[in-house]
Amino acid sequence: MDRKKLLKVLNLDNFTAIDFETTGLDPKNDRIIEVAAIKFKNGVITDKYVQLINPEVKISSFITGITGITNKMIKSSPTEEMIIDDFLYFLGEDPLVGHNIYFDDNFLKNLCKRLGRDIQKHVKYDTLQLARSVLFDQPVFNLAALSEYFGFSSKGSHRAEVDTHNTGMIFIELIEELASHPIKLISTVYDFIKDKEIPNQKLYSDIAKELNKAGKIKTGLVKSKIKRNFPINKFYCEGKNEISNFDSETIFGNDGILKENIDNFEFRPDQIKYSKIIKEIFSKEKSIGVIEAGTGLGKSMAYLYGAIDNSSDFENNGPTIIACHTKNLQDQLFNNDLPKLSKTLDVPIKAVLLKGRRNYLCKTRFKWLTSDSKTLDKNDLEALIPIFFWMEFTKTGDLSECSGFFNSRREWLKSMICSEPGFCTGEICNKQHSCFYGKLKKLLFQANIIVVNHSLLMVEVANPGILPEHNSVIIDEAHNLIKSAYDQFKIDWTEQNSLYQIQNIDPSSPRSARWNSILNTICSQNPELSKIIEDLKRSIKEAKDSLKVMMINISNENYSQFDPLKTYQNKPILKNIEKTFQIVSEDIDLMEKNLKNIIELIDKIRKSILEIDNTRSKYGTLHSIFENGHDKISHLLSDLMCLTANQDNDTVYWMEGEFKLKNTSKERLSISLHASMIDPSVNMAQNFFNRFQNVLLTSATLKVNNSFDYFLKRVGLKNMDSVFKKDFLSPFFYDEQVTFHQYSGAIEISSDFEKIGNLVIDLNRKFKKRMLVLFTSTKTLTETSKYIKNNI
């Protein structure tokens, strides 16, 4: 089906794309400074309306910086009252398309209301929502990024005409991509959103009708133009050779196998030395190696060879664990280096890439949440649409692949659909077939190499049993290990998270409707259990009320320690927590009492259900819900006590503050409480390093002042005898290839993006070299980047 016909059957042969530039984000109090509307007929531009508007208020320098529209430019422009009738006439009854159509629609409605005009009820389409859904794996969804993705110029973006033109063109591309999907997916999404009035609803309906009419079941109306290559989390290589047939020289040497078989492979003598040291570390009964290997040495290939060699005795030694800090390195190791090395050597290997279980989608929980869309608001519905599309393609179930979901900033929804300890059990999730995390856990026990991140490795320290029994660990990017250790041994208390944990076990919550209906069936024949459930509902309400009061009072008592005018708030350390919380002690005591009541009632419910179903075969869902709820509320109670009482001298306590709804009448300070072990090194030594026979810690930067002492002390290796230390310089000629410049002028420029930008431009013109400029402020970086683009 060609484009013209597709638009016709979807009732989009005529549509109008719109975009407004405004003095701010508030549709009631801010004003429009530029409008653009472009008419499309059969996918071709036929007419346009573009007009600067005098808002009769001053345009801030911030808005001028974004749009390029100055007060001088709009001084002689017509006011909104002078253009509104012509603009509304131009819009007519056509469907309206916008990028985040809610923004433009709200400004249009307020404009009409303010000037006493009726507005035609248009069918609305949103390219932002569509892009998040059908391009769910793209990293960015702003108009400029999407324009470049589809090959349209983004020059002049944030001016209404350019943005409107690109919105219309992008919309057509997105329609074609959406129409490439089969009826099952399109109908599923339509059924999910049909009860709420949201943009693109009619598009899903029209595509479904046309697919039905055409009798297409497994294919779409058109073919997709997108080629997707989705990541995997398991890698198998059958391999005919034994790894014992190779050594470092035959693999990495100047006449070695990698040199012969891999394009652009460079012989590096230190790579061979590094590889031999790793093999020596893993051959000893007990050995820990700390090796600094400069960038470009080829350390990942070298330690992967060591891991494959070490794992050849998998039955006796278990798998080799490889841990790194960044996702980029994980992807490089698993999707590039490991396959390349094992296939080139043709050796057998079974490898798995594992993340913490909350990174994975639980199909059961997702089905429960989406089966009753009435419990979700419009924003929730739109945020979840990308998940439906991503599920058609994912091979891993790793939610981080679905950027479209996270782009909506409804991250709390992740906690409603991710795999959950104590909930995602075989008895529940087996019904959904191919449970992502459960399937991966089974593969772990067959793998001889397991790639994880530092965070999961530290979770294993605190709660052994996530990984199979193993004796050998390789830690790359080891300079970041201590940060992950602090994060693991840290306690956080926020009102939002605490409320979520309490609501999770609330039978009266709309999101508990599915399991609550099962509970109601049991209660109808069990008056005693019914009474306990009512007591639980009452206790949960009291806990939520006391939580709100407690956090408000903590915020009020500590308001003076924070400043709403500051971008970055202080994080005051609490030297005496009993004194800090003395004034709100009654609130804390009440919160403690309510949490204990909930735990006691959950215990009674668990006991009652077990008496009815002692084989756990009939009400598996309820068993899991209340067991998990008991663990979560108990953990919440423990955190509250740790943070507000019984101060530990080996722990640092602090609070953080964030001003919500800034610069509005509803502005408020939200406080969160935190605690962390001051020095996790002792814990690391006892519960981590002492557990294993062989450990390699490596990175490009481990030494401080040419010594490993600081690093060894921080990670708990200072007093261990079996630590081997070695460093290798980078093979790059930094002194010849790179020069470092630091500004030391008398004028302070660190927060002045124009002066920084001019300095960068001058240096670029002087040296005529590629440059890397380092910033510590994202805001300054962004503003400087814009300034350079506009002035270079």
For each feature predicted by the language model, list its residue ranges.
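Signature of the SF2 helicase/ATPase Hel1-core->accessory helical subdomain module
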Residues: 303, 331, 421-449, 453-593, ...
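Conserved helicase motor "Helicase C" RecA-like lobe of SF1/SF2 P-loop NTPases
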Residues: 776-792
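Walker A/P-loop
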Residues: 284-305
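Conserved non-catalytic scaffold segment of RNase H-like nuclease domains
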Residues: 1-123, 136-158
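Acidic two-metal-ion nuclease catalytic site recognized across multiple nuclease folds
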Residues: 1-10, 173-250
